[in-house]
Amino acid sequence: MKRYDKYDELYLLEAIQDAGLKNVQVIASDEIRQKMIDKFVDFSLNKSDERIFLNFKEPTNVYYKNSYCLQVLKNNPQKGKFYLFAEESKSCLVLNNWGEVLEILENLPYMNVYILDELLSYVISVTEEDNMIFTGIELNEKFRNYKE
């Protein structure tokens, strides 16, 4: 079995392809990436403490319903971390690297996942199965520099 560098995004993408995960879509086009960001999320920088604030758009959008997710991310977003939320149980799983993300994807095959690369490494994972909603987000320095 091939081994993948858990901290290298390119190795994660290769591992996903090798695993043949049908529920994972890798979005590499700048145009598509921006459309996804525009569709789902409003970003604003708080200049006083450099936190990134995330506001999910449209009350009908599934992401907007995850108020616990918003609360955690607004209060304590950590650069380079991935967040997975279970809405019903109000639990938050913080993942440290791409390897951990891949492990979650392999064990939750019913989730629909979108991975955006480069400027904003951004993972959206959502399912309504069993009344649970998962959302994962990574914040990174490239995004801060890109938006300012």
Regions found by a protein language model. Name each.
Residues 1-131, 137-148:
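Structured alpha/beta or helical-core interaction and ligand-binding surfaces enriched in interleaved
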